[in-house]
Regions:
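Acidic donor-binding loop of glycosyltransferase active sites
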Residues: 243-257, 266
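Short N-terminal targeting/anchoring amphipathic segment
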Residues: 65-83
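Catalytic binding pocket for nucleotide-activated donors in carbohydrate/polymer assembly enzymes
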Residues: 257-305
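Donor-nucleotide binding loops and adjacent catalytic segments primarily
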Residues: 165-248
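A short, glycine/small-residue-rich beta-strand->loop->alpha-helix junction that serves as a flexible
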Residues: 1-6, 189-191
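C-terminal amphipathic helix plus adjacent low-complexity
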Residues: 312-401
């Protein structure tokens, strides 16, 4: 959800002067249209395995080009670590489009760093959202001179945030009892153990209410929460609006968590997720070293419990909250919006970057080939294993024609996105010409006829 939160902050800043549209492969996009009044389109990601990698690249390109033509968009802004080949191909197919890479800093030294130069050359501009921990950034983007640095981006805005009382009413909480927010993931066993260790650190906090954004259960439905906690699972979007409800927070050290909880002055323990490109440990160390938050050792379950327990001390909470008042303003959303608007109002140089694009695609194919060889043996071992021990309840994608829909009701959109039926989402107010073009794109991608569904 990190890119969605940043994109939402930028889109909200653009609304007075432009018509921003958010496109994403994340299911969380279902929350945005009705709650923020921003038009959105969901695109099924490559991980759905509904088509080959090469076909998906072309599908993404065609979806973006069709949306640009429908809306007369001037700029495509990509927020992520690796710009998809389909995104770059869309820019190359229509040189009148300007492509901006919103490239977050604090990268770990992962293989993606080797093609940073080629990727940068395909962009019309690169913007780095500021990070309060930037002085601890020693990753591959930290020394590059190809980006414009802005202030940090956050959906939390003091002027929009609900008061403590109103926020608690919105979440259905007792107004007088303490509340702790826990935003840690579940899934693999090590991640689950961290969730349990963090919750154990809250035991003994008198009258505490614990709010989680997802149920604390493993993949088999077994509870990860210790006995004795009053736990409630609550979904509220955007969560930044109700942060004043909380007396304490336990969160992964992702960009959004840090730049929402700390500006809201929520006393927080950070438990880093070391997977992926984001250097969460560097961010957590900075927050701890300068007194803005507490860092738990993500590799030590006992330390997680011990560190979280410190939040039960009102003096610790008061100290952390007061320190967070010193943080700089998180005005990066408006700054990025200004950059995008300026680019949109200046005529584009109509030249495709064909040579650089070809080099980048060649490198991408080489990387895929290396991964393919490395994974081939593992895949065959896995196939033999799965033949001997088949899945008991394998879910298959329904091979029916794709369904087109333009619902913006979160529950309906969530259900369509998560279903096994191939779902094609349309922006609100789509023209008949756009519908027809999208039908052709779907036929090329899936090879079936399509059905239309409207709510």
């Amino acid at each position: 959800m990190g890119h969605l939160a940043r994109a939402s902050a930028v889109a909200l800043a653009l609304k007075p002067v432009a018509n921003p549209i958010i496109v994403s492969m994340a299911g969380g996009i279902a929350e945005i249209p009705s709650f923020m009044g921003i038009r959105c389109e969901y695109i099924p990601g490559r991980d759905r395995l509904w088509m080959s990698r090469e076909r998906w690249d072309a599908y993404l390109r065609d979806r973006l080009l069709a949306l640009v033509e429908e809306t007369d968009a001037r700029v495509i802004s990509f927020d992520g670590v690796v710009p998809y080949p389909g995104v770059i191909a869309a820019r190359n197919a229509n040189p009148k489009i300007k492509l901006v890479w919103v490239r977050r800093g604090l990268w770990q030294k992962k293989p993606q760093r080797f093609i940073l130069g080629l990727q940068a050359k395909m962009m019309d501009a690169i913007v780095e959202p500021g990070d309060i921990a930037r002085s601890y950034d020693f990753g591959p983007t930290s020394k590059r001179k190809d980006s414009v640095l802005t202030s940090p981006v956050s959906l939390f805005r003091q002027e929009d945030a609900l008061s403590r009382e109103d926020a608690r009413k919105a979440l259905g909480l007792d107004l007088n009892r303490p509340v702790a927010l826990v935003q840690l993931g579940t899934g693999d066993s090590d991640v689950n153990h961290k969730m349990t260790a963090a919750l154990e650190g809250l035991l003994g906090w008198k009258d505490l209410q614990v709010i989680l954004t997802k149920a604390p259960v493993d993949k088999n439905g077994n509870s990860l929460a210790p006995e004795g906690l009053d736990i409630k699972v609550a979904r509220y979007f955007p969560l930044a609006k109700v942060l004043h409800a909380f007396d304490a927070g336990i969160c992964a050290t992702g960009y959004n968590g840090v730049h929402e909880l700390l500006p809201a002055q929520v006393p927080t323990v950070f438990v880093s997720n070391i997977r992926g490109t984001d250097d969460q440990e560097a961010r957590a160390r900075w927050c701890n070293d300068f007194g803005y938050a507490l860092r738990a050792d993500q590799a030590d379950l006992a330390d997680i419990t011990k560190t979280v327990k410190q939040l039960q001390d009102p003096e610790v909470r008061a100290r952390l909250s007061a320190k967070c008042a010193e943080l700089p303003a998180t005005t990066g959303g408006q700054e990025i919006a200004d950059i995008l608007y300026a680019l949109a109002t200046v005529p584009a140089a109509a030249s495709a970057k064909t040579f650089t694009f070809s080099r980048l695609m060649a490198q991408d194919h080489i990387n895929r080939g290396i991964r393919h060889v490395a994974n081939l043996g593992l895949r065959r071992v896995a196939l033999v294993y799965r033949f001997i021990f088949p899945h008991k309840d394998a879910q298959e994608t329904k091979q029916a024609p794709p369904i087109f829909g333009d619902s913006i009701v979160p529950a309906e959109l969530h259900a369509l996105i998560k279903s096994s039926t191939r779902f094609e989402h349309l922006i609100t107010g789509a023209s008949s010409v756009y519908r027809a073009k999208r039908e052709g794109i779907a036929m090329s991608a899936y090879g079936d006829l399509v059905e239309f569904f409207k709510k």
